[in-house]
Amino acid sequence: KGITYNVINSHLNNIVQQSIDFENKCLTEKLKVTKELIQQNISTNKNKLDEVGEIREKTLFDVFDEFIKEIGNINGWTHGTYEKYIALRNHLYIFSPNLSFDDLTEKGLADFITHLRDEKGLRNSTIGKQLGFLKWFLKWSANNGYHKNMAYLSFKPKLKTTEKRIIFLTWDELMTVYNFSIPESKKYLDRVRDVFCFCCFTSLRYSDVYNLKRFDIKNGALHITTVKTADSLTIDLNKYSQAILDKYDGVPFEDNKALPVISNQKMNDYIKELGQLCGLDQPETVTYYVGNERVDEVYPKYELMGTHTGRRTFISNAIMMGIPPQVVMKWTGHSDYKAMKPYIAIADSAKAEAMKLFNEK
C-alpha cells in the first residue's frame, strides 16, 4: 500500500511502548499475568490496528499535527505562530476533510488557492502566506518520508499584491495624543494612552511591553529579550518614555510589571477610540487584491490604529529625524536592512515635502 518506513517504525515503537507499559503495570500493581489479561491489553489497544491486522497509515492531518508539535518546539513558536498554522490546518480540513498528500498535485494546490479566494474571501497577500506555510509543511513531511509528491516545488502562482501600507503617527499626531486632555467620562483611556505612547517612544511590540518588568529597567535603558524573536536588546530611554515610567513608579502591578498593560484585543479597541477622540480621522486608503480584482477601501485613520502602530510610529519618526537606520535597528532588533526600506521611503517622501516649504518663502 506504499506505507513508508517512518509509519512502520512509528507503529512498531507504539507496540513496544504498549508492551513496556503493560509490563510496568503488572509489576507495580502486582498483577498475575494471565492469558485473559494479555488479551484484554491487546483489545484495549486494538485501535492501533485495522480489522485485518494491517498497519494503518497516518493521515495528512495526523502528520500536520506532528509537524506543528515538533517544529513549534524546535523553533520556540509563539502563541501567534501556532495560531497561524492551526488556521492553515483548519482551511485544509474545510477544503477536504479526507485530504491526502497525493491530492496536492499542482491542480490540487490550485484548487486550494481558489477555495481560499472564493469560499474564504482571503486577500492575495494572505493566501501567499498560507501557501508559504503549506510548502514548509510539505517539505518537512517529504523529508521525513511521509510522501513523495513534489508538485509543491514547481507550484508558483502569480498573486497580485501591493506593498503593505504602514500606518503610523507623525510627530505632531503623537504629541496630540500624548498631551490630549482625556475627559473624566473616558478616564479608562488614560492608561491605554500611556502604554501606547510608551511603545511609540521605545519601539516595543505589544508582547514585549506586556512582559516588561521593573527589573528590566536599569541605567536609563530597557534591557529585554523579545518574545517574538528572542533578541536581547538594550533600548535607551528618552524623556518621554522615562516620564511615563516615572508616572507609575511605586504603583504595584501583577508580576512586578512596569506598566498597566491590558489584553491586546481590548487595547486595540481602546486605541481606536483614543484616536477618534484625538481627531485622527483623516482618510487613509488601503489597497489590496482578491484574485485579479483590485479593492480600494478608505478608512478614517483611527480605525487602522492598534498596538502595532506604536512600533511603526517609533521607526518612522526616528528615521525622519535623521537617525541612521543601522542605529534604529539596534533598538528594534531588526537584523534585515530590507525591513527598513519602507520606512526610509516614508522619510524620503517627507523630506521632499519639507523642501517645498522653501518655495513658499
Where are these regions (language model features)?
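N-terminal helical hairpins
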Residues: K1-K58, D62, E66, E70-N75
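N-terminal DNA-binding recognition helix of tyrosine site-specific recombinases/integrases
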Residues: H91, D102-L104, E119-L153, R205-S207, ...
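Basic, Lys/Arg- and aromatic-enriched nucleic-acid-binding interface segment
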Residues: N124, G128, H147, A151-Y206, ...
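Short, basic (Lys/Arg/His-rich) helix/loop patches that form interaction surfaces
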Residues: E184-K186, P252-F253, K257, K272-K330
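Conserved tyrosine-mediated DNA breakage-rejoining catalytic core shared by Y-recombinases
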Residues: T202, N211-K247
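Short, polar N-cap/turn motifs at the start of nucleic acid-interacting alpha helices
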Residues: F215-A221, L304, M321-P342
